[in-house]
Each structure stands twice: as structure tokens, then as C-alpha cells.
């Protein structure tokens, strides 16, 4: 386990500060490969004399102030180089010109071009194109600002998280202790740390007293690690004499020499590794790109075909170019950009209410397409608090209550042995509750002390009342603190129980060491000699609890003889003058960081949703496996190679790995695997746990999953997780326990640190993908009744049935609210029962969606519009036969005697009023047929009658579009502003039959879909 490049003094990876050529292909790849290697350094193997020579530090007086200033000038401040951030204007431009916006910009430019051509050629300049260009530009700018504002809001929340680095450090220079800003600590400085401090740089410990550090942000180990001057392991991350930058000292004191500062620390290397990783495009960005290709393809194909056709029909070049531009622009769904942005924003808000903060909108959908989740164990799957799980006394195992709300099992507390055990656990314990928490529930209280002692303290407080009172009654007179050589902690107390001796000795520690010091055992409150049978019982209990992945402690006591130890006896803990052997064994207590309540259910949900959950942890394999079984990552009945070997009683190497569905892989084994071996494991095992892994390995695991084609979500809270968070398709950081570095690297933050929230997020992501399909299907359908009038106008030479301004009224007016309302649609079936979508096959917009929207529903809609158009012209005297070829005379403002079918003559003004009335009627017809389209788009497979009309926003959308259409048609002054004229009430009904036809047609199609799944109707029309 470890990080780093194979050099004693490791260089930081290239960042802009160090003149590295970032982003220059080969060099950068090489740097990243360097960073992925494990750390090697020699400092932990050196003697104090060698350290003194290497760093020139006096081991008692420290550096001189002058020398420290020189080193500071040479190495720069002891701080992490901030990751290169994207300037705000670049972010803004991305929103304005990225993806879909580009399509609209091209449309706008083409409009201005068409307007310019008409103006220059002195044809009657028609201002429609100018308006259209302006409106398109406005749409892009407004939605761009909106998306930018959304993301800026999330990044402001991020800014508020920055407070990772330690502020002050205690150094010794010229023999004096100085408190200086941690940024000014230099290599070779002599530094002192005490409980509660953050380690200011990578230190080589030269002296320590009971020092423990919390390395969880670096290695993921939840237990505090002892620090001492002893060289205990070749691996710098495992040895006791190195303390790492930005980890916490939880108790004791230590003095050390700074061996690395800033970016050269182990933590600094990880941060550099994270900031250098490139995240790819999000799945939804890929989808939108694909969609733009389709739309552009259709537009250009239609435009060019009709350009050639209009030349064949003897139009002038100039007119043909204007037609070409007109058709391309008519194909652009102006309202869709806004719809997609609003839909994603709504989902992001909904997720925020469910404790998922999404940093960029596109991540919303990515979570929905996730097929593998690599989850951290501590704090995400578990509660991140050690809790007493089992006890062994009176020769049987009792289960304690580990639930968060104390609703679980309780055990028999009447046995006198339990009273004795609880007394030892409370007295032989240095953990305390800080004052002022009397009204806080016991389990929620803060504790000063290490994780195991806190667990014991809370357990005894819950079962037996105030531990503080117990300690006050049984006053402590002597103590030997825990140390790594004797592996026990002992204290002597004045005994408050008058029926026993004056002094009570209590001891706890590693079970086998405690048992060795005992000659008797307490059963039902009576002392009995410790025979082989009882020793076996102890051994079995110890193995059983250890096998559950729990941390087991043994407890014993001794009532000291009143004659030997009279009142006021002076206990000497240096030269021990009291017995520490021949004690009475009382029992075992085992602790575990228990799983969160909702996790097993959610892991099951992931499994039925086809999502593979992999546990990646820095913890012990036994503990990791126990928790994996507890939360269902390894499901009941599935065995690992070790389980099979134990069952068949054969060596592990004789088991075929393919026989085991589950596997637990140790970090050290992972270190020696090549990419093919990792791929083999990921491919052939469904349930995988990686234990004792380093951050680099987490990154390698993520890359392995991505090679399999998986879309990977990774959760993490430590700095150690940030490279993997950055590399994953979606990185999920923890809001409560997460370090700032991990929050910076992630795409999403879980505000309650709970795995269950991820699954909620997956559900929301899948739902928005379905609903976006529906929104797009709805929006695209009206494109056909908008384009066909223009095409028929060119081919049949008839008066224009639908004008540009009216098209805008549909796309940016009546269609907007209904399209957005589909984002609120409920899921049709259980979304979490289907496999994750395959990004290569299952597209947001596919050929089937286009064929439904353009080829089927859209065509029926166009018929409805034309029907209204011909009805109005016929009522005014122009029968369809008269209209063919009438266009040139109709458009000429100097011809005032165009004859209708009845021989009446029409002036230019009168003709135009009839034409604009037709535009209005065509517009209203599209609104009427879009009612049916909105209702059929609610579902893709179910009948609307099964789904019901529960979506209130959608019902509002139906009324809103109708009200808006009526307003535009009847409001005084609209004839001047938008050239819309009032309609006779009967003309509203022209499109009703077509609306009904659409509804019936689609209900029948969905019925066939449900009756014969996988049939040709599904293959051709299910989008």
C-alpha cells in the first residue's frame, strides 16, 4: 500500500507553477503514470544521526531562523498548489456556445443572412427573418445565463467548503518554541504536535508519548494509528515513524523532523494526481451531440433537396437561397434548449431536497446511466462510529443493540458478571463526554477519546447510567496507559462497594494477552478456576467474534487484598508494586462500525436495477467482508474462494476461482496484478470487495471498470479518494465527513453521507432520461406542421399557410410549459427493475423517435393544419383548385384584382388579411393537435388510462397553451404586432378530429406494444 514514484525525494507532478508542460501529451501521461505508482522513501529507515546529516537539523535546537528562511525561499510555501480553475468567462462562453446553443446560433446567423440578401436585392424586405434572428439569439443568451447561474450557485456552495489546511504549527528554531503559520514550515524543521492538532507537513517522528493519528482521510483506516520513533515496516505508509501532512493527531504528543512540504507531501501528490486527471464528456452531453447531428442532418437534407427542387421549378437563385435558409431554420427546435435546461434544473432541485447536491446539471443524468458503483465503506455504507456489537460473559455470546435508534436486540442485564464487566469497561477507560451535552441523546454526543473507548463509554452510559458518577465514586489511584508492547491498559480504583475489598484493579486489552494474565474466571458472579475447557470456550468465542470483522477486547479485574494494600497505599506504576498476573477474567466485548439502516435495502435495489456495487476500502479484509455481507454486497449463499476452500477442507489454490461468485481482494495482491488480471476479476465475479487499498489502486479499479464499458460512480470522503472521484463518470463526495479536496473533485455531494441517497439519485437520473425523451418527442412533433406549409408553398405555389412569427409563437410560447411539464411525469413502471441503459445502443434521440415524431404523429398534425387552412380560404371564396399556382400574383403588392373561384376580385390588403387569418388558424390547429400529442407523450408503453392524469403541472400546461393561443388570436392589437387575426369559433374545431385520431392511433400502437413485446411494432416505433 502506498503512493508515489520510485525516488527518495519525489518531484511534484507538472503543474503550471513548476514549469511542467501540462496537457502536452506524452509528458503529462508520463507524470500521471509516475503518480499512479506507490510511494518509496528512505527517511523512515534512517537513524537519527543520518537524519541530522541529511537535513542539517539540530535534533534539540531545530534549524536556525536564517537557514529556515533560505529553505523557504528555495522550496516555496508549505501549501498545496490550488488546482487550475476554469475562469468564469470561459464557463459562461461554454454555456453560450456549447452543444445545442451552436445550432441556434447558426440558425440566427442564417436568418440575418436571409434578411440581408432580401434587403440588398431590394425585394420587398420582409422583417420576419430579422425578428427570428433576434429571437433566436435572445433564446440562446437567456438559457445560457440561466445554466451558468445554476452552476455558479453550486460552485458557491463549494467555495464555502475551503478550510482543509492546518493554520498554525509549533516549531523549534534556535532552541525556542515558536507558533508560526503552517505555510512557513520548511523541510528540516523540528515540529511538535499534540492531540487535536493537524499534522503540518510529512514528519519523521523522533520522539513520541502515546501519540495516535487519524489517517482515515489518507488511507481509509477508521482506527487511530500509533506513532512512535520505531521503524516498523518497509512500506512508508505502514511504518509507525512517519506522520503525514493534513492527517490529525488524536491523542498524545510527538516531535518530528519535516521531510516534505506542500506539493511534495504524500497528500500533495494525491491532490496533484486528482487535478491532472481529465474527466470525459458526460453521457448526456454525448447524447445531445448525437441529437444535434440527427437534427442538422434532417435540416440540411431537406434544405438542399428543396433548393434543387425550387431551381427546377424555375425560381430565381436568390429565392432558392432564401428558401434553403428558411427550411433549415424551420427545422431548428428553438424551445428545446430551454426545455432541456429547465428539466435538468428541476431534477437537480428535487435531488437537493433528497440530500444530493449536484454541481453540474449534466451529472443529474449520468447518475441514471450508472452501471457500477464503487463505494467507500466507512461512513457511506456504515455509520462511521464504533459501536459495541457483542459481549461474551457467563460462557455465552450476547448481542448488543447497534441500531441508530436503539430499536434492536437487548440482552439480559441481571447477571452479576455483567455488572462487573460494565464496571471495568467504564473505569478502565479514558474517554469522556465534553460538558454541556446533558440534553443530547447519548448516541449523538461528542466524545473525547479514541473510537473503541468512545463505543464502550456510550454503551455503558446507555445500559448502566452515568459513567461520570461511577468514576467519581470509584476514585482512580493509579494507571498504566495502553502501549504497544504490553497491549493492555490497567487502572487501580478505590472500591465504592463496601462488601468487597478496599482497592479494585481493572484491566482491558488484547484478549489473548488478558487471558494469559488470568488464573480464574467469573461465571454468574462466582470466581472459578480457569481450566482447559473454559480456555477453549474463550478461544471459540474470540474466533467467532473476530470472524464477524469485529474488534475484540478482553476484560479482567482483581480485588486487592486489604492487608497487603492498606488505605493510602502508594501504587508505583514505574516499578510495579502490585499484582498484574493471577487476575480474574470477566468477559469479552467486541465492537464494529455498524452498517447504516437503509443500506441493505438500497444495495438490493441496485442489484435489481442491474447495478454492480463494489466495495473499496482501506480497512481489514475480514471487517470489509463482514460489512459486505451485512449490507448485501456479498449476498447470502454466495461464497468466496476462501469460503469454498474452508467448506471442502482443501487449500485455497486448489479452488477454481470461477466457482466463486464473490471475491475479497487484498491491496497487496492487487499491486501485483496487470490490467488483464484485473479485467478478469471484474468480468467473472459479480460481488467484489477490495480491502486494504491505496488511492492509486482505487483509481486503477475505476479505470478497470471503465475498460469493461461500465459507467462508474465512485463515492469517497478522504483526500485519498479524489483521483478516483475525478476519473469516474460521476464522483460522489461526502458532505459531512468529506474533505475539501474530495468535494472539489466530485460532481455530486451527498449532504447526509448516506449510500441510500445515491440510489435515490440513480432513480431520479433514470426518470429524467425517460422524461427528456418524452419532452423531445413532444417538441419535435410540431416541427413537421411547421415545415410542411413552407414546403407546399414552394412546390404547389400556394399562399403561405404558416408564417415565421407564428412558428415562434408555438416553439417559444404555447409548447414551452407543456414540454417542461413532462419533466414532472411519474415513472411508468418500476424504473429500478430494469438494466442500466447501454450508452452505445440506447440513445436519447434515436431513429425510432424521429420516425414517430416526424413521420407519423407530425404528419397527422400537418393534415389538421392544412384542413383548417383550406376551410378558411374556401369559406372566403378560394377553393383548393384555384390556389395552385396563384402565389406570384398573390404576393405582388401592385396586383389588386386577383380573382377567387366565384370571380370576386381581391385587393392586396384584403388577400393578406385572409392569409394572416389562415396563419392564425393553422397555429390554433397545431395547439389543438398538440393537446393529444402531450397526452400520448406521457407514456412510452403504458396506456394513458393506466398512467392517469396525476401530473398537475401537465394539466396546467394544457390550459396554459390554450389560453395563450386564444389570447394571441383575440387580443386587440395582435393584428399589428404579430399579424394574428381573430378566428370564428367554428374554425377552432377543424383540427379536433385529427387530435382524436392521434390519440386513438397511439393508444392502439401502445396496446400492440404491450400485447406482443419485441414484435415489429416495438422494433419500429418504441423510442
Swiss-Prot record:
Residues 1-5 form a propeptide. Its EC number is 7.2.2.13. PROSITE patterns: ATPASE_E1_E2. Residues 1-11 have a biased composition (Basic and acidic residues). GO terms for biological process: intracellular potassium ion homeostasis; intracellular sodium ion homeostasis; potassium ion import across plasma membrane; proton transmembrane transport; sodium ion export across plasma membrane. SMART domains: Cation_ATPase_N. This alpha subunit is resistant to ouabain. Residues 6-87, 153-288, 339-772, 824-843, 939-951, 1007-1023 are cytoplasmic. Residues 109-131, 309-320, 793-802, 867-918, 971-985 are extracellular. The chain crosses the membrane at residues 88-108, 132-152, 289-308, 321-338, 773-792, 803-823, 844-866, 919-938, 952-970, 986-1006. NCBIfam families: ATPase-IIC_X-K (TIGR01106), ATPase_P-type (TIGR01494). This is the catalytic component of the active enzyme, which catalyzes the hydrolysis of ATP coupled with the exchange of sodium and potassium ions across the plasma membrane. This action creates the electrochemical gradient of sodium and potassium ions, providing the energy for active transport of various nutrients. The sodium/potassium-transporting ATPase is composed of a catalytic alpha subunit, an auxiliary non-catalytic beta subunit and an additional regulatory subunit. Belongs to the cation transport ATPase (P-type) (TC 3.A.3) family. Type IIC subfamily. This is Sodium/potassium-transporting ATPase subunit alpha-1. It comes from Rhinella marina (Cane toad).
